């Protein structure tokens, strides 16, 4: 039976992952992931992290299934850099039984190729929040309503957008950081924008500015302040959702994250 997205969400408490196999581990065929959990969340990125926390706040126990690994910053070389990419950047999980099966590695990004374009997506606890630029731009009302005419932009503007920024800890770049030598290119860009007759804005960004200040002061090795954050941030300055939404959900005792676990099928009970 094929479920629509809406019907799937409505029946989420009755959905089981029929074949949930931790990578490199065996699974118990006599136990469904829903035996002890009322809801299953597939993926731990932005949407999955928010769902886990909101369910926990409602008193609903959930299990978050994530195919990728948990990345914890330890030292200054947890993540690959744009200057020195290595296998940590790539999700490389060959089909079972293939000749390259032994080369499997749960890296940060999976490349999905189509006939005309290839796309990359996060494959880790925290999902895309670890591997995006950290900029949180609020769409203008006309653009938002052209895509979501059935949603209230005023509610999003007054309640939900501010709530997200507060939860993540996102804010525009502070003036003292923008004035530093590390951000001379940004200042040049803003001057060029103004010279062209446009208005340069400073959108909210999901970084811990105090950590970036330490980078600029030379107290810790530079990472975010030199643009090294697309593949994770080795100074831990990026406020990814595993450090806020998902952390709070797990701390409530009502959410469990099961990493290195891939969902292969969804069936209706």
Task: Report each predicted region and the residues it spans.
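N-terminal secretory signal peptides
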Residues: 1-7
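Conserved redox-cofactor binding core of oxidoreductases
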Residues: 150-262
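Conserved beta-strand-loop-beta-strand element in the redox core of flavoprotein oxidoreductases
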Residues: 265-269
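N-terminal export signals
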Residues: 7-27
